[in-house]
Structures are given as structure tokens and as C-alpha cells.
């Protein structure tokens, strides 16, 4: 099958937002107007097309990023729906990694909310161009210009309206296009009948003012436009559109649009903006990777003529076809039935069938071209972030960073039959979601699952029950603490055993130093002159890694420590890998006496919205929970308090806030960083873990 849409006419976009900003409804409307759905599904009726897992339909939130393909104005638009809830950040990160552009949906009553900040920050890290859609203009309290202001204040974004609303709340009836300087008036409920008229008299002055601001902002990003602007020459609409496109693709400018997806207003204009301002695969830099055979850096430009290279960004288990691997093709062409190399794992994979996904239905295709997104059936060893490439032109593309889990639960199967099924279920769920970890406590035999938050683990336990029919008892959530060293030290680990026959002998000197936050464990071999033979060096590193998994203070995994093996000795006959592993673990224990070991706890960025009258209570809550306030701002009759609070102190806070504010207060929290726990708390944790 020949290529249907050229690369220039392809858009890979994500729709990202805070939970409840109306993202799924917006995606639904896109699918409706692009002819993919015949009836519109509402999230609050639990009938949405993109939310196809049962839990999503019940909770009215989007958990898995379903990839959908649609057509608009002669272009192919691949849409990845991303979740807005903070517990599912990996889903957002995975989708951002394979997108070329994104639409950020705001609730125009609230503007930028905490999760919007998190997703925006991630999109900035990945260099993703964005347009902003201020949604819910029909809602009470909707304020378009306030939303634009929050983009400046909270995100320091160079964002400017390219539209203005006509009316707001119940009176929201149309949109002013600041480029054409025309009014688009909606005359029916489905938003399919649009009248283009002159701008109403009472809005003309405001429209002229904001068009002038728009031209000035765009001119500042382009020298030629700036010269014209300063010399008072007229900038044509075509020049303005080209200027906006260039600045948006360079992530220097963010066009802001408005509408109400629920009331079917503004979605088609937003689709026009996706085509006009967001990049095609040709507009973004060629993806870079490393050749696994030569270690040389290589590029893969977007072209069907280049060798095949793709990134697997999502694994899903489908009840009908089994394991689906979603992938983005960066270069080359892939045919079903062919073989590819998984360069991340060094394994050859056969592509069984290739499917193009539409929310919950699928179309089988023979060939997928560069710049496209599809799902493959039949890949056995591929996991999230793996590179799939031509066998003759191997390359490893930059993978997807996985955040560490911050919360854990104990799960216990209800019966022996459940025990076997639970192992399989947890393994499958962990394959789909890299932020979900499963560990078995060697001493107690308990199974512990860890994830990004309570909702995250709730959903996974729920899926285990529904999809895999496993009945399990679930313990109370526990915080995932970590341990580290705060001072440098040198320590000896000496192990010698003589008990008839072959003895054991291992002797090492290791220097331990604190590592930068987030850098993890780093091992350096600085042995000179073979005082520890080469074949035993890996055993020393392994011995340290195994010991660090259980910490030195309270049994928590150690992070951010450098270990330099610089001296030692061995015995010709008695030295073995086991002896050096034990010696390394003894060195770690010895180091703990002088390296100032510390317990680290996850700190959450908590945003609390409460009525002005309850501000004192809220500040009291933060202080009582060992938190520190980072900032406050007024919004209508409410106050928004931002604070850093330990996760350990946040369990049950929803109930406390509800009763203090008569149900009017809300809060959101997102993991921010790890921090040392105070000495008194550290002593309590150690006591508790030693069962005192």
C-alpha cells in the first residue's frame, strides 16, 4: 500500500492537561469532527471513546494513553491521549517522548493548575512545541484572560491569544479570530454550523488591542518581522501565520485559543491551529542514537529512504490479540511479517501484524511509514523505551527515563490458586508500566508492590482483580524511604574463613563518597598492580549492590553513593567470588559507622485550594505535617497555598481538609524530590523497622 499522507501532512500530537480540564472530551470532539465517531461520548456519562479501560470509565479519568489516528483538512493527525492525574506521570513522559507537538488544555476558570505545571515542565524538557486551548468557556467563572495571565505567572510562558471569546459562561456564543479579524458565531448545538461575521462593535477595540500585542510578540521572535514592525510597515496575515508557526516550532511562543469542547465550540478552529502551527516530522531535528557496534553517534532523519528505526513507547495487553507494542517510526518503512532488531536488548523480533489504532477499534495494515505511530502484535522481548531498528543498520535511540516509585503496599493472595495467578498478573502489569515495581521480601515472603501514588496502586490492584481474576488482601500504603551517605569515608572489608578443606579469603579497601541527587550508585575500579585480581572486581561491585538493596540503617535501598575500590589483597587458593562479595558487604557495614548514613523521604509539592476564611487552618495543617509553605495566591474568594510536605504526613489529609473547610477545600500533590528526614523521625523509623 502506497503512502497515504506525506510527511509534511502528518502531525503527531498529544493532548495534555490537569485532571478534569476536559481533555478527554476535547479528544472526543476531535474524533467526532474528523469523522471517526458517529455519536459523541461524554466522560461524565462514562461513555467516552478514548477511555476504554473499565476503571477509566468508572472514575472518569484517563489512565492509559490510547493512540488514535484521525484526518483533518487533508492531513493525518495521530493523537496520543495522556492522563492528567499525577500518579500516571510515566504515561505522560512516554507519550511526550514520541510526540512532535501538543495541545495543552486548560480549565478557563482555574487557568494553570498543579498538574499542568508538571506536564508543562516535562514537555519543555523534551522540547515539545505546544498550543494552548482554554476550555470550559461555558462554565461559571470562566475567565479567558485570567487563564492567559496564569500561563505567564506560573509557567513564565511566552503565551499570547490568537483568539478572543465572545461572551462567557452561559453567554459564550462565538470566537474572534485575531489573525483574520473576523468573528465565528456558533448557531447550533453540535457546533457544525458556523457563521463568519464582522467583529461585533463592542468587541472591536479589544480585538484590535490584542491583535497589536500578538504582532509585537511574534515580531520579537523574528528579526525580519521586527524590522518591518519597527518601520511601521504592515505585516500581512500570511507573514503573521508563518511567524507564529516558526516561533511555536522553536518553542519560543505558545498560541492560546479558547472554546468549550462540551458545548462543541472552538474545536474545529483548534484543529486548524494544530495543522497551521504544530510541526510535522520534517520540522523537528532528526532523532539521535548510538550505534551499538561502534559506539558512534548517528542520526535518523524522517524519511522513508532511511533505514528503519522506531521507539516502543507503550506495552498493552489486549483481550483479543494479546500483547500490543505501540511504537513511533522515526525513519524507514516496516512491513508486517518482517524481522527487526531490538537493539536495547540485543534480540531479534518478528513483527506479526501491524495495527493502526482508533481508541478501542483497530485496523490491520501491511506497512507503516516514517513519522507514523502504530501497534505491533507478536513482540516477545520488547518493553517500554526499547529501540527497534533495521537488522543491517542498528542504532539505540535515547530511552525513556523512569521515575522512582514513592509509595508501596503489601499484597497477599487470598488462596493458593490466587498465589500463582497473582505472580503472572503482577509480572504482566509491571511489563506495561515501568513505574510499577514488584518485590518479594526474602525474609517474610511478602509481596510488596510500589508505584507513584495511591490512585496508581488502586488502579493496578483493581486491574489485577478484574482482568486476571486474582483476589488479594491489600495492606495499608507505606512510604518508600531511601538511604544514603552524607559524608565521605574509607572502609576495609576483610573476610577469612578456615574450616578444613578449601577456605575463603577476600580483602578490600573502598572509598565511599556521596553522589549527586538522582545519580544513583556508581562504582569505580581504581586497583593498581593486581592486588585484587581482575576476575574478582565484578564480585565486589555485585556484593555492594546486593547489600545496598537492604540499606545500613533501616533496611531501605541505598541511593546516590559512589564507591571506589582502591586496595585489597587476595589468597592464591582461598579467594573466590563469594569471598569478595562478602568482603564488599562488610566494607559497606564498616563505612556506615563514619559516613553519616541518612534516611531520605519523598517530598510532595502540595497545592491546597481553600476558602479565604480557612487560610489559618490550612497553614496550620502544613506546619503540623512538617511542611514548608512555598507560596500563596488569591483566586476569587479562595486562597491557593503551595507547600512541600513529606508524603508520610499526607495520608488521610483529604478527610482533614474536608472537615476543616466544610467540603469546600481541595488539594493535589505531586512527587517533587527526596530529602533527609529529621533526626527524631529517623530514630522512630529505625526503631519501628527493628520491631522495638
Curated annotation (Swiss-Prot):
Keywords for this protein: Cytoplasm, Elongation factor, GTP-binding, Nucleotide-binding, Protein biosynthesis
InterPro entries, per database record: EFG_II, EFG_III, EFG_III/V, EFG_IV, EFG_V, EFG_V-like, EFTu-like_2, G_TR_CS
Residues in tr-type G domain copies: 8-282
Pfam families, sorted: EFG_C, EFG_III, EFG_IV, GTP_EFTU, GTP_EFTU_D2
Gene Ontology BP term (one): ribosome disassembly
Gene behind the chain: fusA
Protein name according to UniProt: Elongation factor G
PROSITE patterns in UniProt: G_TR_1 (PS00301), G_TR_2 (PS51722)
Residues the entry annotates as binding GTP: 17-24, 81-85, 135-138
Amino acid at each position: 500500500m502506497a503512502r497515504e499522507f506525506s510527511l509534511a501532512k502528518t502531525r503527531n500530537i498529544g493532548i495534555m492537561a490537569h485532571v478534569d480540564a476536559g481533555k478527554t472530551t476535547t479528544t472526543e470532539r476531535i474524533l467526532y469532527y474528523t469523522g471517526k465517531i458517529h455519536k459523541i461520548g461524554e466522560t461524565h456519562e462514562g461513555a467516552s471513546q478514548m477511555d476504554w479501560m473499565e476503571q477509566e470509565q468508572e472514575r472518569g479519568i484517563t489512565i492509559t494513553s490510547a493512540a488514535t489516528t484521525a484526518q483533518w483538512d487533508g492531513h493525518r493527525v495521530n493523537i496520543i491521549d495522556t492522563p492528567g492525574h499525577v500518579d500516571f506521570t510515566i504515561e505522560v513522559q512516554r507519550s511526550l517522548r514520541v510526540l512532535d507537538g501538543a495541545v495543552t488544555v486548560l480549565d478557563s476558570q482555574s487557568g494553570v493548575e498543579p498538574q499542568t505545571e508538571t506536564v508543562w515542565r516535562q514537555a519543555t524538557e523534551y522540547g515539545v512545541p505546544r498550543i494552548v486551548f482554554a476550555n470550559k468557556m461555558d462554565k461559571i467563572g470562566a475567565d479567558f484572560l485570567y487563564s492567559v495571565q496564569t500561563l505567564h505567572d506560573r509557567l513564565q510562558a511566552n503565551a499570547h491569544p490568537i483568539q478572543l471569546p465572545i461572551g462567557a459562561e452561559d453567554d459564550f456564543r462565538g470566537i474572534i479570530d485575531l489573525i483574520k479579524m473576523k468573528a465565528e458565531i456558533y448557531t447550533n448545538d453540535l457546533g457544525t454550523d458556523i457563521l463568519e461575521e464582522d467583529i461585533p462593535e463592542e468587541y472591536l477595540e479589544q480585538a484590535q488591542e490584542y491583535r497589536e500585542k500578538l504582532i509585537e510578540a511574534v515580531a520579537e521572535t523574528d528579526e525580519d518581522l521586527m524590522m518591518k514592525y519597527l518601520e511601521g510597515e504592515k505585516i500581512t496575515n500570511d507573514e503573521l501565520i508563518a511567524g507564529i508557526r516558526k516561533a511555536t516550532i522553536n518553542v519560543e511562543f505558545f498560541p492560546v485559543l479558547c472554546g468549550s469542547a462540551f458545548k462543541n465550540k472552538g474545536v474545529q478552529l483548534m484543529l486548524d491551529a494544530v495543522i497551521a502551527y504544530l510541526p510535522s516530522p520534517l520540522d523537528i531535528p532528526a532523532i539521535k542514537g548510538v550505534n551499538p557496534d561502534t559506539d558512534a553517534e548517528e542520526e535518523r532523519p524522517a524519511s522513508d529512504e532511511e533505514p528503519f528505526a522506531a521507539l516502543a513507547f507503550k506495552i498493552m495487553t489486549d483481550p483479543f490479540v494479546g500483547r500490543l507494542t505501540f511504537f513511533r517510526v522515526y525513519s524507514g518503512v516496516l512491513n508486517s511479517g518482517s524481522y527487526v532488531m531490538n537493539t536495547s536488548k540485543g534480540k531479534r523480533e518478528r513483527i506479526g501484524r501491524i495495527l493502526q489504532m482508533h481508541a478501542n477499534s483497530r485496523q490491520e495494515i501491511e506497512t507503516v511509514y516514517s513519522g507514523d505511530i502504530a501497534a505491533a502484535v507478536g513482540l516477545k522481548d520488547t518493553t517500554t523505551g526499547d529501540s527497534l531498528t533495521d537488522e543491517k543498520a542498528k542504532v539505540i535511540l535515547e530511552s525513556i527515563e523512569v521515575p522512582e516509585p514513592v509509595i508501596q503496599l503489601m499484597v497477599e493472595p487470598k488462596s493458593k490458586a490466587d498465589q500463582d495467578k497473582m505472580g503472572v498478573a503482577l509480572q504482566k502489569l509491571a511489563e506495561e508500566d515501568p513505574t510499577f515495581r514488584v518485590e518479594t521480601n526474602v525474609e517474610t515472603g511478602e509481596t510488596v508492590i510500589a508505584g507513584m501514588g495511591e490512585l496508581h496502586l488502586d488502579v493496578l490492584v483493581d486491574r489485577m482483580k478484574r482482568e486476571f481474576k486474582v483476589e488479594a488482601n491489600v495492606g495499608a500504603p507505606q512510604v518508600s524511604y531511601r538511604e544514603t551517605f552524607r559524608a565521605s569515608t574509607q572502609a576495609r572489608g576483610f573476610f577469612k574463613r578456615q574450616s578444613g578443606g578449601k577456605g575463603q579469603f577476600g580483602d578490600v579497601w573502598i572509598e565511599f563518597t556521596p553522589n549527586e541527587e538522582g545519580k544513583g550508585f556508581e562504582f569505580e575500579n581504581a586497583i593498581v598492580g593486581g592486588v585484587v585480581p581482575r576476575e574478582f572486581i565484578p564480585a565486589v561491585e555485585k556484593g555492594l549492590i546486593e547489600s545496598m538493596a537492604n540499606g545500613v540503617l533501616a533496611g531501605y535501598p541505598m541511593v546516590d553513593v559512589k564507591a571506589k575500590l582502591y586496595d585489597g589483597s587476595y589468597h592464591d587458593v582461598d579467594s573466590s567470588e563469594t569471598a569478595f562479595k562478602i568482603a564488599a558487604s562488610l566494607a559497606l557495614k564498616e563505612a556506615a559507622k563514619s559516613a553519616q548514613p541518612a534516611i531520605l523521604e519523598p517530598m510532595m509539592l502540595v497545592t491546597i485550594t481553600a476558602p479565604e476564611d480557612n487560610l489559618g487552618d490550612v497553614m496550620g495543617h502544613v506546619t503540623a505535617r512538617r511542611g514548608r509553605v512555598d507560596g500563596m495566591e488569591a483566586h476569587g474568594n479562595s486562597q491557593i497555598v503551595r507547600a512541600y510536605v513529606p508524603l508520610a504526613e499526607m495520608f488521610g489529609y483529604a478527610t482533614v481538609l474536608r472537615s476543616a473547610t466544610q467540603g469546600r477545600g481541595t488539594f493535589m500533590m505531586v512527587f517533587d524530590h527526596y530529602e533527609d528526614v529529621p533526626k527524631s523521625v529517623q530514630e522512630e523509623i529505625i526503631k519501628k523497622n527493628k520491631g522495638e
